Amino acid sequence: MAKEILFNIEARDQLKKGVDALANAVKVTLGPKGRNVIIEKKFGAPHITKDGVTVAKEIELTDAYQNTGAQLVKEVASKTGDDAGDGTTTATVLAQAIIAEGLKNVTAGASPMDIKRGIDKAVAKVVDSIKHQAEKVGDNYDKIEQVATVSANNDPVIGKLIADAMRKVSKDGVITIEEAKGTDTTIGVVEGMQFDRGYLSAYFVTNTEKMECEMEKPYILIYDKKISNLKDFLPILEPAVQSGRPLLVIAEDVDSEALTTLVVNRLRSQLKICAVKAPGFGDRRKEMLEDIAVLTGGVAVLYVGAASEVEMKEKKDRVDDALRATRAAIEEGIVAGGGVAYIRAIESLDGLKGENDDETTGIAIIKRAIEEPLRQIVANAGKEGAVVVQKVSEGKGDFGYNARTDVYENMHAAGVVDPAKVTRVALENAASIAGMFLTTECVIVEKKEDKPEMPMGAPGMGGMGGMM
């Protein structure tokens, strides 16, 4: 396939058009007064969402160069969603801001590599500041409720549901999301756990009438790799045999030799054992094995109800965002929300200098870029960003602007908090992709081939009758 190549300013300009197209569509969703985006679907009703990564994933541009730029920022949103569960829109806004500021300086003749080094130094300082600002959540379910509420687009009902679910199965418990039959959103707690896998051999069956393997108070061995040699497992198998308790083995797979050995032991020594293949695939499998490992008080199921299918999808997106953000908050703590944590981190950059002028420029780019989430939240609320940023910058600690109520107040006290992990990961991913963008000198894309139109048939060639 033939390729097209663009270099230097021309290449970066085309990439930036793609970045802006995607980022402008995503950033309208940021903050409590962020707007919805309607996505056309080829089949079924349109999808209405306020989830940044959902919007990003739907965007494909016709121009190959611009589409390459859009895909770079899409990667920022996706990776942030995967790593932290939320903050996809914030990461997109930050990436766009760093790219825009950086591109001005690179075009003016600054060294892209030195600017990238300055950006990396500044990001490391901001991350340290976020870690120092973070406040641990612990078992404080009120704080958990605050995080869930903010992440669910300031829906207190969803926030309370997630906090209640965590109270019932502990903050490390398993919580799943399903569609309700009616319009109400409720919580159900299922004792134990269910996954879609069965025994690997019929010889493990204990109830031949029902063809089921039933065990009481078994030891459970969870292994995230393939079992191919049972010698390594003998130290685990022997205590199980001596205790007389059954043993359930959940592994990625068990090869035929190891499975035969288990079956022979089951038949000869009456060892109560059963081997099961782990549920899920790839990263999802690892998550599910972790869920099984921490299973304590059963599984909480959030049944999401809505009046229509369109509303159901949108609400389910928000519940999923809120749940994942809550997990992130439990992991690394919470910071003041509404972009305030970034504003407070600017102070940590005041004394930071680069090894040369271009590195110092890179530090200044981050100083300016981390104001952008607050500016965008304010813009989406219909106010003037520069004025609010100035006033919040003059404040101390958790003082910030609550866009939902249009009031300047203590963000922690008002319940406007973000998970520290989300705040950190959003900046790290945005800076990583922006740095790659600024140091790009050449873009190669596939050349579109003009497909010739089908030739028209000559007169008199409509059928076979004219043939001799």
Could you describe each region identified by the protein language model?
Residues L15, G31, G85, G109, ...:
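Residue-level signature of catalytic and energy-coupling elements of molecular machines
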Residues N8, R12, K16-A23, Q66, ...:
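Amphipathic alpha-helical transducer elements in NTP-driven molecular machines
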Residues F7, E60, Q66-N67, V299-M468:
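Extended, low-charge hydrophobic alpha-helical regions
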